[in-house]
């Protein structure tokens, strides 16, 4: 484990890409953020970086259709992947997204970890499980963030976290589960600590 702590508040937008072929060179370390279209992915990125509009939050889920890259430090990037599984998106587009997501997880050499965000009230939908499977198959560590934790009481929250921790045991990969709330800042420290540990190899060079 590294003791180097990155300052995520310095994160800035780098570039957008329609697919993996248009991404910048495959070097340094990238950490991907993935989740259903309404899981609160952009909100979590904004909370982590303490910037209100770093990642555009949208009232229309499924808005983030590009792969958006943000730079924390040189060689350290956060990648906001297109939200998946929104009903109002045409089937053809859904298939394209899923193909792009799968391709990115399997082929991107600099990808060091995946943060998968799920609404704590509706975790582990089919596509969430697919993402965990892909990540584990690609030997990538996963942090599952159960978002919108402020919507539940403390006891209901603990119960959901425990349930998800038990449900993911069959995946057998390096998967950690944490409750998260952008509203009352729950889980932000744990998210930052996990990212620090994933970025550590490039920082200690």
Swiss-Prot record:
Might you name a Gene Ontology BP term for this protein? Answer: division septum assembly
Q: So which cofactors does this thing need?
A: Mg(2+)
Q: What is this protein called?
A: Probable GTP-binding protein EngB
The similarity comment for this entry is: Belongs to the TRAFAC class TrmE-Era-EngA-EngB-Septin-like GTPase superfamily. EngB GTPase family.
Q: Which residues bind Mg(2+)?
A: 42, 64
Lineage here is:
Bacteria, Pseudomonadati, Pseudomonadota, Gammaproteobacteria, Pasteurellales
User: What keywords are annotated for this sequence in UniProt?
Assistant: Cell cycle, Cell division, GTP-binding, Magnesium, Metal-binding, Nucleotide-binding, Septation
Q: Which gene encodes it?
A: engB
**Record-level GO cellular component terms:** cytosol
> From what superkingdom does this record's organism come?
Bacteria
Q: Which residues form the EngB-type G domain?
A: 27-201
Report residues binding GTP: 35-42, 62-66, 80-83, 147-150, 180-182
A Pfam family hit: MMR_HSR1
The record ties this protein, via InterPro entries, to: G_ENGB_dom, GTP-bd, GTP-bd_ribosome_bio_YsxC, P-loop_NTPase
> Can you provide one Gene Ontology molecular function annotated for this UniProt record?
metal ion binding
Annotated function = Necessary for normal cell division and for the maintenance of normal septation.
* Family matches, as Gene3D superfamilies: P-loop containing nucleotide triphosphate hydrolases
